[in-house]
């Protein structure tokens, strides 16, 4: 059994969101993701992993190619393998609990407009060019 207290695991950074892996289980992991107001994730996907987010506190907007959904405490979102998504934090600090599973969990980033220092990796450009 793995048992965690999300409030004692949280860690925030004003420059970028913080993800902390709390544990690994089988072909997956459980993490806590801490977001300051206004922070935005890259527009990305996990080609071989399902990703589930549960909003513990705070909130924001989750975008996919087909919809935009407001996320509030108690909400959870399931992204199947390969689904592009972007998280945009609302006006409050946000604490998300995340579960990823399905073998290879690395992500592919398509774009990150809110990060002027971001440059696409060759493997990401190749992945999206093939789609």
Regions found by a protein language model. Name each.
Residues 1-31, 42, 109-131:
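A short, N-terminal "cap"/entry segment at the start of jelly-roll beta-barrel domains
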Residues 66-81:
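Short acidic-glycine-tyrosine-enriched beta hairpin
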Residues 34-36, 45-62:
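Short, conserved beta-strand element in jelly-roll/cupin
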Residues 37, 48-49, 67, 83, ...:
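A generic "binding-loop/recognition-motif" signal
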Residues 61, 81-108:
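Ligand-binding loop in jelly-roll beta-barrel domains
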